UniProtKB/Swiss-Prot annotation:
UniProt-annotated binding residues for Mg(2+): D103
Pathway: Carbohydrate degradation; glycolysis; D-glyceraldehyde 3-phosphate and glycerone phosphate from D-glucose: step 3/4
Active site, UniProt feature: D127
Name listed for the protein in its UniProt record: ATP-dependent 6-phosphofructokinase
Cell division in keyword set: no
Biological process annotations from GO: canonical glycolysis; fructose 1,6-bisphosphate metabolic process; fructose 6-phosphate metabolic process
GO cellular component terms listed in the entry, alphabetical order: 6-phosphofructokinase complex
Binding site for substrate: T125, I126, D127, R162, M169, G170, R171, E222, R243, H249, M250, Q251, R252
Residue positions binding ADP: R21, A22, V23, T24, K25, R154, G185, A186, D187, K213, D214, H215
InterPro entries tied to this protein: ATP_PFK, ATP_PFK_prok-type, PFKA_ATP_prok, Phosphofructokinase_CS, Phosphofructokinase_dom, PKF_sf
């Protein structure tokens, strides 16, 4: 193996650049050439490749987003499109690929491996919804951004004795909502994986105001319903002023946290070593604080398990 490629796919996440940097520097240390593939699998098929050197990645560790750019490219599920991508890799002399992204990105990495190009996947998504890893690149940064935003929302909520329903990302996974909800002292956390009772939440808010509290915060994962709809449901059971706020894409931006930088660096370094050992079709994860690997195929049948005990902790916090 003399040359490897790296791409980012799907939604961007803080820490992707740190992973790209780690892959590049590790590969060069082991005598390999590195090419960045711009715009994900779309760029792979188009042959949009750029050489990466220590000099052009070294300062990227503190930057959010992905300087290789990203794109969603569902067409890569088609066999003939995959073959075009493999032909581009052969044309450029690239022997293996590291893919950073979420579930769809892993499908692409597995397809490349099946076509004879060893590929390793790194979990890059703020949702933290990948099976067999406790952590995905970007999750910690997204939580910090959401927490900072809710701290500011609380200031204005307290000034007007208002309730805010704050919508955070997480279509099928409530990890951001749970962690941020506990960290921001939310009155309620609502996620798609667990049942909830709007009436009980309204009663909790009402009791808080009666006890002298001057605001209410509900953290709502986007996969449950819109913040506006939840607010309207809430007001059927409570006599208070309520507003909806959607944090949306701001959660993907910003400089990555220490946790994201360190873990992305460790994962990127490890991924290169897996390729050097001739391994492919693997996903790198972090389990119990340690690097781990699983066959990508296993991820498709697996299920992410969040730290749902946080809901119980937060419920106790709201009773007093």
């Amino acid at each position: 193996m003399k040359r490897i490629g790296i791409l980012t796919s799907g939604g961007d996440a803080p820490g992707m650049n740190a992973a790209i940097r780690a892959v590049t520097k590790t590969a060069i240390h082991h005598g390999l050439e590195v090419f960045g593939i711009r715009y994900g699998f779309a760029g792979l098929v188009a042959g949009d490749f750029v050489p990466l050197t220590t000099e052009n990645v070294d300062h990227k560790i503190s930057e959010g987003g992905t300087f290789l750019y990203s794109a969603r490219f569902p067409e890569f599920a088609q066999e003939e499109v995959q073959q075009k991508g493999v032909e581009q890799l052969k044309k450029h002399g690239i022997d293996a690929v590291i893919v950073i992204g979420g579930d769809g990105s892993y499908h692409g990495a597995l397809a490349l491996t099946r076509h004879g190009v060893n590929s390793v996947g790194l979990p890059g998504t703020i949702d933290n919804d990948i099976p067999y890893t406790d952590y995905t690149i970007g999750f910690d940064s997204a939580c910090r951004t959401a927490m900072d935003a809710i701290d500011k929302i609380r200031d204005t909520a307290s000034s007007h004795h208002r309730v805010f329903v704050v919508n955070v990302m997480g279509r099928e996974c409530g990890d951001i909502a749970m962690r941020v909800g506990v960290a921001s002292g939310a009155d309620a956390i609502v996620i798609p994986e667990r049942p909830y009772d709007v009436k009980e939440i309204a009663e909790t808010i009402t009791r808080g105001f009666a006890d002298g509290k001057d605001h209410g915060i509900i953290v709502l994962a986007e996969g449950v319903m819109t913040a506006d709809k939840f607010k309207d449901e809430l007001l059927k059971y409570g006599d208070f002023d309520a507003r909806a706020n959607v944090l949306a894409h701001m959660q993907r931006g910003g400089s990555p946290t220490v946790t994201d930088r360190v873990n992305a660096t460790k994962m990127g370094n490890y991924a290169v070593k897996l390729l050097l050992d001739g391994k492919g079709g693997l996903a790198v994860g972090m389990e119990n604080g340690q690097l781990s690997t699983h066959d990508i195929l296993d991820l498709f049948d697996g299920k992410h398990h969040g730290d749902y005990a946080l809901l119980d902790v937060n419920e106790e916090m709201t009773k007093y």
